[in-house]
Amino acid sequence: MGRRVAVFSTAALALLIAGGAWMSAHRFHPGYEVGEENERENGRPPVEGDYWAVRLAYGGDPQHLRFEPTWMLESARQDRAIAEAVPTGRRSYVRSAETALALDPDAFTLLGPMPLRGEGFGADSAAGRTNVIVSDPDDPAIAYLGSDGGGVWKTTNCCSAATTWTVKTDFPEIASMAIGDLTVDPQNHNVLYAGTGDLRYGSFSFGAAGILKSMDKGETWSVLGQDVFNPLYGPSTNGFPQYQSIGKVVVDPNDSDNVIVGTKTGVFFSYDAGGTWDGPCFTNAFSTSTTAQRQDMTGLLAVNRSGSTVLYAAVGTRGLPTPVQPDLANNGANGVYRANMPSSGCPAVADWTLLTNGFPAGTGSGAPNTSRGRLEIAVAPTNPLILYAMFTDVTTRGILGIYKTLDGGDTWASIGAPGSPGSQMWYDAGITVSPTDPNVFFVSTVDLFRSTNGGTSYTNMTDAYSGGPVHPDNHARAFVGGDPQKLLNGNDGGIYFVDNAISATGSGNANWIPLNDTLPTIEVYHGDITANFATAATSGVNAGFQDNGSATAVFNGTPAATSWNATNGGDGIVSRIEPVLGQRWYYSSQNGNLTVSTNGPNNPEASASGAWSGDVLSFVFPFDIYRYGALDVAGSGCTSAQGCTHLIAGSNRVWETTTGGVSGSGWAAKTGNVTKNNLILGGDNRSFINNIHYSVSDPTVAILATNDGNVQYVFGLGAAGAATAVNVTGSNAVLPNRPMLDATTDPLNPLIGYAAVGGFAQNTPSRPGHVFQVTCSAQCASFSWLDKTGNLPDIPANAIIANPNIPKQVFVGMDWGLYYTDDISVPTPVWQRFEGLPHVMVWSFTIDRGFTTLAAFTRSRGVWAWPLPVSQGGGADLAVTITPPDRVTPGLEMHYSITVTNNGSDAAVNVQLASPTPAGLTFGSNTGDCTTAFPCVLGTLAAGETRNVTTSACVSRTYTLPAPVPLTASVDSDTTDPVPGNNSASASAPLVLSVFADGFDCL
């Protein structure tokens, strides 16, 4: 018998009825705050650049972060050993009678964004970053793209606003969905290769997982070289571990068996179409010199010269170190190298020729420099002797120079360069030459530029930050059907098409069309869903996106993939929704900048930040709202008048407000520093809170996870003065001293908690594991930990949450997907991977008020929702609903009906129904299955049985507030209820004022 329940509002989204009015207000003016900042210019975000290294390689000593590639290979073997099954509830899901909608119980439902609208750039349709594009040489209607984390996508109806995309790489063998390059075999257009990993030096780039190969025009794929192209590689002496990635893949135009791959560690060769590999091979002698120079391959060409294949390899190490990749300053090998295609093995260094004639002095000399950074190369399809090369400038991060050769690279001449390329050319770069004219080429920068005269002058074809039609930060280009007018362009906002690429005089009359309407590839951090998401007639969602701000979506009916509407810019981080009234929608951007809309899912109109800017805090600053409180119960944090008003946030200490945080009001530091304060990298302190959550059942209790390995409980929240933080880390005697990425409590018992742990077990060999359970006595005066990792793969666990309907069912979001156990209580839980969700990084979870839905927020594959299963073990699942009157008129009697249904498999004994009369009204009578005043004793309800009660009340002629009139009801019994979330309900009725001449009430 469970009497402690939450009250869930069926009117929580009253504002949603207004529909489109939300979406028309506050259009953005283009600028860096629209969608993104000048985002990776300093090489540091997210989390100031080193979060990638820390979350993988920290093991208690910040000066010795450690990673070995073999660890990931072993993790992949562990992952393959997990049975590809689904949660018990997925196949025997019991849908309650109130579930009128149709979220798929057998798989997660994609919610989008598909696409993102209103972010402020002219095309008004965005997706996530596109790294590479290929147009099919045989059929211009077929095109492929590679996402930075969402896999390979294909269209067969390119290129119009009606273009549709289908992902082709959702299969269990792929452990990384980051695609660095795509290429079609020049001799067999049915064959494609995709290189995994992201070469662009981003702080949060994903590593490689092999070469993908398709032999049927991208319909199916196999994985090659998993043991060769490891996701990461070990650090240099006293350095950080760094990620491997495949930035270039080319096929010998004269022999399809020869495949050449450019990576962050050199060149690899296959002479059997990817079956086996030789490498890494080096174009120079500086890979093993006293001060080893990096061998990042940012350019790779296999050029057909009258039946002979000539290779060009561009070493283009960025040159500017980052906290993640400190040896990027070792760029002394940067330059263009040429060799003939070998017949086997690695070409000897002596077989490569460094091309220097006309390039800046010192190119490829082995001496690190502050000028020559990333290097891009391209060949003219109509003349194999004409090539272009573009150096970025290490110091300015712009273009150092563009060079052209007419003799296959023997001599180079400097030509002009675009005048305003931006200052992140280490990130936005690339050249593609026209298929018909060697003097026409396009250059990717923040914008896309065109030259029609061999580089003498350039035209800006996109003008993103001046109201242009295309998203900024361009990466990929592909001509369609060999037509120089028809160009596909990929950038941080997805993919775009223009059919007058040559004849347009500029961005103003270029016929750009976004092709993003079916491309859900945005990188998502944290988000939220509205109350009773799976059952409400109108529901909503919001989330924050890397590079693309924050956004919302509203569903009238069953939630499904749809377009979202941007609300604010920057790097969107955490978003939350007040669930009772649906008025306050919270958003945040990098480093703890919180904002709020107080009139639904509109653009924020007020700051909601506290005074934490001087604290040590995460780029991905966490905050949460307590959403489960019973309405109008003292201390619950939720009222019918104000909704839920308790919010919590984490820097290196805990902050809370009990007034909704509007205009920053009410935030107060509740604790001191809850970290170890010892994760210091150089001069940067990385000891901060990664995640913080209220307990499900008690708003006075919270649990938090820190980057430096702490888990702490916080007691005494919701009251004035300081709260009490209790460190339950236990000196890491059981809990590993690795990054704690998330923590949550048991839905019923707040003194039972769970921690999701990052890193790898090899860094804490005596304390392995990724999921741990803590059990506390009162106020955690004593506590004990248990390792619940079971058969989970040894990869970072990013998020953890338990099903409030079945508390033993726990979900974990990892780098390779979503895993679950149906029984966390056993000593060694059995975990399985949920195959109804793509195998991508799951960054965070949320469960709605009402316990109907689990939402998962993923990197580069959007937002997903799944109807939470209910208990399969019997019990009486009592559900109560209220049908309010169409209107309430002062001076007249009102009537509302209450329905109680037993959706469980067992009879409910001693059922009691309560419905307090709203203030200002006078109870009249009950009819139907109850004829007494409340509480009504309904007796025993058999499985499937329903009781109906109609209540009348008199509304005083002087009644004015609250309006609308709030109505609540709750039901209970002596029988265990496995789904307490539907034991209570609320609704509201609109107040319609009227004048009565008789002056009497309810006559």
Task: Tell me what each language-model feature is.
Residues 1-11:
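N-terminal Sec-pathway targeting helices
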Residues 2, 369-372, 881:
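Short intrinsically disordered, low-complexity coil segments enriched in acidic
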Residues 10-20:
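Hydrophobic membrane-insertion alpha-helices, especially the h-region
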Residues 12-13, 52, 483, 537, ...:
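Exposed boundary/loop context
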Residues 19-28:
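Bacterial Sec-dependent signal peptides at the C-terminal "C-region" and cleavage site
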Residues 27-870:
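Beta-propeller blade termini and top-face loops
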